[in-house]
């Protein structure tokens, strides 16, 4: 298999259990995305493997620990380790989330939502600018999945994210599964969100699966990254690229990891839709399953 089988914009998330397969078999993709924090130790076995894989794949560094929404600012040690990783790997993309996860040196095992207020906006933008100055490059900010919202928020999430981009010149990572999940949980329309986001600033798209959890009050949709991409999210992707064109597109799968072939099959679905969009054709009716 050559690394031209997939469209160059199609990639998958590289997770530690799949390391050996990608290292030895080199599936025919152009790029892989890592969780930055898993590779902060420069002499670790997995870091050495990654260095070798980086000779064959472009690498994107996707962070989960910068906690850009923290009032106290970005942890300097965390930023230093990220900078060392970025300087060594020279990834073509670096990203993190519209969220916070650290307070007073204590890290939470989740990406927590922000209140969408002017005060939070100033904090978030200050931290983004600090990181971009340290890394000497723009970073991508990903829209979150969310399960609660603050009563004192004064603007919508999409307005907040758009303003972050305007004030910091960062780029955007559009997670379509997060949009779909949050739209159900909070009762907004996906199209309202997607039409408000400045498409020209979107450099990457994430596609993943979600889980439905039943509660006494009703259902909640959770962005678990443990399922195939849903038909509805595929349809959002098809519509978005038809309107705005090709972007680097990632298949995310973090929990209940399937065999690599299953992951690559999801990537092939994205590849099919992307190539069809570039040819201005529609390979399938939205009602048809992609499985």
Curated annotation (Swiss-Prot):
PANTHER family (alphabetical): UPF0276 PROTEIN HI_1600
Domain of life: Bacteria
Family (UniProt): Belongs to the UPF0276 family.
SUPFAM superfamilies: Xylose isomerase-like
Coiled coil: none
Designated name of the protein: UPF0276 protein VV1_0952
InterPro entries per UniProt: MbnB/TglH/ChrH, Xyl_isomerase-like_sf
Gene3D superfamilies in UniProt: Divalent-metal-dependent TIM barrel enzymes (3.20.20.150)
